[in-house]
Amino acid sequence: MVKESDILVVGGGHAGIEASLVAAKMGARVHLITMLIDTIGLASCNPAIGGLGKGHLTKEVDVLGGAMGIITDNSGLQYRVLNASKGPAVRGTRAQIDMDTYRIFARNLVLSTPNLSVSQEMTESLIIKNDEVVGVTTNINNTYKAKKVIITTGTFLKGVVHIGEHQNQNGRFGENASNSLALNLRELGFKVDRLKTGTCPRVAGNSIDFEGLEEHFGDTNPPYFSYKTKDFNPTQLSCFITYTNPITHQIIRDNFHRAPLFSGQIEGIGPRYCPSIEDKINRFSEKERHQLFLEPQTIHKSEYYINGLSTSLPLDVQEKVIHSIKGLENALITRYGYAIEYDFIQPTELTHTLETKKIKGLYLAGQINGTTGYEEAAAQGLMAGINAVLALKNQAPFILKRNEAYIGVLIDDLITKGTNEPYRMFTSRAEYRLLLREDNTLFRLGEHAYRLGLMEQDFYKELEKDKQAIQENLKRLKECVLTPSKEVLKRLNELDENPINDKMDGVSLLARDSFNIEKMRSFFSFLAPLNERVLEQIKIECKYNIYIEKQHENIAKMDSMLKVSIPKGFVFKGIPGLSLEAVEKLEKFRPKSLFEASEISGITPANLDVLHLYIHLRKNS
């Protein structure tokens, strides 16, 4: 049976959901093929969305028309701002989610979206003609024709689950691996490697002794992810903190020989920033304890996820380990921890649109590209979906720069550097993080969303008014000169503010931590009518004014540098500071400008600086 659509999406995880929904929203006829409709949107690992860097991604996905933020706001159990005591650039919103509610909400959204159809089957191979994808075949002899195909298979490509010595060919515990498609992708000549990730055991809530455990609350004023969320008054359940101890560690050490991670059974490389408990005990042998969070999986609190105890140790060892931990002495394990090893394609095989270089019309998103995490997957799925539609319409691709969004950092890192371990987003990966804050996501990306048809016109008009108000009032504050006159000192004293001893502008005054929004409105009458969103931006811009201006200068310099032409016949060999790999790639592709050089996989900003210097030196000589 042959069926046709504009875009096919393979896989109903977090990347597949965003790719399907955004493409349908932009007017394409989309068909989603997934192994099990009931697992669309399943949170396979921890019951949480967001965090440091990840919260930024979630909010960016939301502004650009994605669904993760609104689903989370409708299914959360606890909401917090991480790093709340630090600067706004490194704060991250995080929510514990009800895994059942999240999955049901996501599934219903997918099933009720116009232009989007869904079928339950397994994709087995791609149909390729003249190096262009034209469709797929499935395990029930269906053939689907499409102009674009987006693969979002997660950990299912040749997936193997490990629990102790036992191995099963699963893409997730109890679910079949996708072996035929994995073989097909290898046969097409893609550079395929193996990665490993893992998950933690879950225990029955009524078997935990919470007495004496540290209770972890949500924020009094809970943050939310989606700008569309109104009247937010969510459930706030507690999490609990406990710790491993020397007895726990000895049990694990005594069973290192039975751990797939150390026995050679697992070959794939695991996530650096989410190591298994056996890896932590091995690498940090001097530590006497490791922190664990007991997180409710649903509002019913019937199961708790033991965050920090990812493991693939044998079942009997997992029992001993858990029962050695305070509060879990009599815990009943409902689901054991396991490791999963799977195929991924080196993301250097992709362009910035997430289309493969080898096969036209084929896009990859999510863990197939070597990332880890729901948020990283959602961001890639969204971008693949948008770009697949734009390609259908013969319109220019949508590529976010590193100075525009964490999504830009994520994709640029993947396609230029590749990865040999599961890639996770952190704020430290963004060199322009002062400009890429959670609080200014709407102002950064609203114009893009509106242009793509992913933001309502009325809302965008209000956003533009706010943006203009921010710029105009910052200018006014810079021009507003304050002197230590009697009137100024009196007004500062009334606001319980320290006096000024010298001349200063309004921006410098508002840079004070103590000068809150209420004081801003009181001291500067022209700020009084402005809404909270505008005043918050003005406050942050004033506080970090010097650093923000410096980052804008660096961006301008980089933009100017990328316009520099590389002379015809330029010799790259022998330039100090250029690695052999960089020289080989530059000689092979012969870029005509530094911008073209920056698009080559493996060419770093440091390489561009060196090239810029030597082009300048050779021109002068």
From Swiss-Prot:
Subcellular locations according to the entry: Cytoplasm
Listed GO MF terms: flavin adenine dinucleotide binding
Biological process terms in GO annotation: tRNA methylation; tRNA wobble uridine modification
PROSITE patterns according to UniProt: GIDA_1, GIDA_2
Pfam families noted in UniProt: GIDA, GIDA_C_1st, SAM_GIDA_C
PANTHER family recorded: GLUCOSE INHIBITED DIVISION PROTEIN A, PROTEIN MTO1 HOMOLOG, MITOCHONDRIAL
Oligomer status and interactors: Homodimer. Heterotetramer of two MnmE and two MnmG subunits.
Stated family: Belongs to the MnmG family.
Described function: NAD-binding protein involved in the addition of a carboxymethylaminomethyl (cmnm) group at the wobble position (U34) of certain tRNAs, forming tRNA-cmnm(5)s(2)U34.
Protein name: tRNA uridine 5-carboxymethylaminomethyl modification enzyme MnmG
Source organism (scientific name): Helicobacter pylori (strain G27)
